[in-house]
Amino acid sequence: MLWENMCQRILPFAFNTVLWYQGESNASVDEANIYLEFLRALTSSWRREFKNENMRFIIIQLADHLDRAGYAWEKIQSEQLRAEKEIPLVNTVVCRDVCDNIDIHPKEKDVLSQRIVDLLK
């Protein structure tokens, strides 16, 4: 659905880097158990469709959150880090350390932004 509604429309255009800020609503146990394979498929298909085998992906790690603690959340966080080691041209921006655990979105977005900029240099 994301592909058809958003990405397919921009296929004629080119870009070098994708920032993947994972949505919190699809962080279930089932999704956590296939998350690394999902990232492999995502990166592979986007590189193929946009005809750019060197397309970089920067993944913004799920933030820590008290209401979301548990297996699925932590598994996705760890798979996001694992992706950096196992999928070419993938980097993960850690954000567990800039969270207050109350708001699902980290308040220190300047820190996250700087980490992204540092990866792009």
Model-derived features with residue positions:
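Cell-envelope and extracellular/periplasmic
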Residues: 1-121
